[in-house]
Amino acid sequence: MSNILDGRELAKEIKERIKKETEILEKKPRIDFLYFEDDKSTEVYFTRAKKQAESVGMIGSLHNLPVNTTEKDFLTLIEYLNEESETSGIMIQMPLPKHISKKKVYETISIEKDADAISHVNLGRIFIGDSNLAPCTAKSAMALIEKSGINIEGANAVVIGRSEIVGKPLAHLLLQKSATVTIAHSKTKNLKELCKNADILCVSIGKAEFITGEYIKEGAVVIDVGINVLEDGSLKGDVNFEEASKLASYITPVPNGVGSVTVSMLLDNVLYLHKNIINKK
């Protein structure tokens, strides 16, 4: 039976450290959350994130925008917050409404206030080895891998998923630790074979319980990034937990795994950005 990598424990450790660091700051970090009123799940997530920010001494500000907000007005708001001296970090709803260009948002947000490291420059920094600022979900997954205690150097790591905010940055974070990394996706033909050879298996594909025990190498560390809501309202990951946990040495549950750490990593990013702004003055 696997050891469980409980994200709640790691999140608590991170927030305790952030709170201590924030307490000694004369000016407190502020994070601005931008989202649209029709996205209720993001509203719930950002409201909780705001409360957690305030619990560690930060300031949170919610921007609940009308659905018909134009792309121009949305980009103008980002530009305003880029210049707003009270704002330390900006967190933007993803995915965006269809009428707003993701590319333009990535290009508009200031690299100095990019709380989820989605700008082209900040993503590029990860690719050249700078991991101080990384997308929150990828950073959370990496922290849980490290918490398992596995020797990452030389390990075979398979990342299933190639998104800009999870799969690709997570692969580069693993590369920085000298893992041998394979990125798999929906077009990968020998997926089961690749997974069976993985010492570290990270899954982010958005398909409930897609990865069964047949994909798991005995003793592997399994990181399940997926969160899928079933018809009965229950939450399931991309990995069949019951089957995988019989083979893996360490595994993240869903819920209470990677998702439990993401807000703490967001706050960690905001604190990092805030300190950089202070140091430049």
UniProtKB/Swiss-Prot annotation:
One of its GO terms (cellular component) is cytosol. GO terms for molecular function: methenyltetrahydrofolate cyclohydrolase activity; methylenetetrahydrofolate dehydrogenase (NADP+) activity. InterPro entries: Aminoacid_DH-like_N_sf, NAD(P)-bd_dom_sf, THF_DH/CycHdrlase, THF_DH/CycHdrlase_cat_dom, THF_DH/CycHdrlase_NAD-bd_dom. Pathway: One-carbon metabolism; tetrahydrofolate interconversion. SUPFAM superfamilies: Aminoacid dehydrogenase-like, N-terminal domain, NAD(P)-binding Rossmann-fold domains. Keywords: Amino-acid biosynthesis, Histidine biosynthesis, Hydrolase, Methionine biosynthesis, Multifunctional enzyme, NADP, One-carbon metabolism, Oxidoreductase, Purine biosynthesis. Pfam families: THF_DHG_CYH, THF_DHG_CYH_C. Its EC number is 1.5.1.5, 3.5.4.9. It catalyses: (6R)-5,10-methylene-5,6,7,8-tetrahydrofolate + NADP(+) = (6R)-5,10-methenyltetrahydrofolate + NADPH; (6R)-5,10-methenyltetrahydrofolate + H2O = (6R)-10-formyltetrahydrofolate + H(+). Coiled coil: none annotated. HAMAP family: THF_DHG_CYH (MF_01576). Belongs to the tetrahydrofolate dehydrogenase/cyclohydrolase family. Catalyzes the oxidation of 5,10-methylenetetrahydrofolate to 5,10-methenyltetrahydrofolate and then the hydrolysis of 5,10-methenyltetrahydrofolate to 10-formyltetrahydrofolate. Homodimer. This is Bifunctional protein FolD.
